[in-house]
Swiss-Prot record:
Cysteine disulfide partners in this protein: none
Binding positions (AMP): T31, R36, K57, L58, V59, G85, F86, P87, R88, Q92, R156, R167
Function field: Catalyzes the reversible transfer of the terminal phosphate group between ATP and AMP. Plays an important role in cellular energy homeostasis and in adenine nucleotide metabolism.
Protein location: Cytoplasm
Domain remarks: Consists of three domains, a large central CORE domain and two small peripheral domains, NMPbind and LID, which undergo movements during catalysis. The LID domain closes over the site of phosphoryl transfer upon ATP binding. Assembling and dissambling the active center during each catalytic cycle provides an effective means to prevent ATP hydrolysis.
Record keywords, A-Z: Acetylation, ATP-binding, Cytoplasm, Kinase, Nucleotide biosynthesis, Nucleotide-binding, Transferase
The protein's name in its UniProt record: Adenylate kinase
Region LID: start-end pairs: 122-159
One GO cellular component, as annotated: cytoplasm
EC number: 2.7.4.3
Species annotation: Shigella flexneri
Major localisation: cytoplasm
Gene that this sequence comes from: adk
Catalytic reaction(s) noted: AMP + ATP = 2 ADP
InterPro entries hit by this protein: Adenyl_kin_sub, Adenylat/UMP-CMP_kin, Adenylat_kinase_CS, Adenylate_kinase_lid-dom, P-loop_NTPase
Length: 214
């Protein structure tokens, strides 16, 4: 089962990706992890990626596609894989198709921007332990304090409203066009496309995914 997850940052993809991996026994492929692993392994592609990154440039789509092809040929991808964060653009999706990387399901996590802002901006973190709270949805027992240690909670830089809104604008400009692209692919019978209501509770979203994926 080969799956692509689409949706804005904060739409709940990460939580559900974990569930899909465990339930269907497929690995999650993140381009960031893949690039780091390739550089570490010193493979031909890894060396190319390292040279580009050392020069402070963005890795080309061609190189990322080559890495994806190499990664999905590995044993743990025999039953499929889960792609999150790639493709991000229509040229990348086209390049994937040309490289013969077919996808069974494209799942779009649909959550209104304002709810995403609410979800992310309300996060509070206990940095030493990694415990995460939310002022509205999962508040600590004492406001601003970690439940276990009583230490101060902080807000991550990435969780500040200005940053979140900037990322949402980027998503709508760059990645949202993929929704139309994959809807057309589904109409042509090349993949299955499903919209998932990401505003529901985690368990409800999980149940919806089980219905879609079987």
């Amino acid at each position: 089962m080969r799956i692509i997850l689409l949706g804005a940052p904060g739409a709940g993809k990460g939580t559900q990706a974990q569930f899909i991996m465990e339930k269907y026994g497929i690995p999650q492929i993140s381009t960031g992890d893949m690039l780091r692993a390739a550089v570490k392994s010193g493979s031909e592609l890894g060396k190319q990626a390292k040279d580009i990154m050392d020069a402070g440039k963005l890795v080309t789509d061609e190189l990322v596609i080559a890495l994806v092809k190499e990664r999905i040929a590995q044993e743990d991808c025999r039953n499929g894989f889960l792609l999150d964060g790639f493709p991000r653009t229509i040229p990348q999706a086209d390049a994937m198709k040309e490289a013969g990387i077919n996808v069974d399901y494209v799942l779009e996590f649909d959550v209104p921007d304002e709810l995403i802002v609410d979800r992310i901006v309300g996060r509070r973190v206990h940095a030493p332990s990694g415990r995460v709270y939310h002022v509205k949805f999962n508040p600590p027992k004492v406001e601003g304090k970690d439940d276990v240690t009583g230490e101060e909670l902080t807000t991550r830089k990435d969780d500040q409203e200005e940053t979140v809104r900037k990322r949402l604008v980027e998503y709508h400009q760059m990645t949202a066009p993929l929704i139309g692209y994959y809807s057309k692919e589904a109409e042509a019978g090349n993949t299955k496309y499903a919209k998932v209501d990401g505003t529901k509770q985690v368990a409800e979203v999980r149940a919806d995914l089980e219905k879609i994926l079987g």
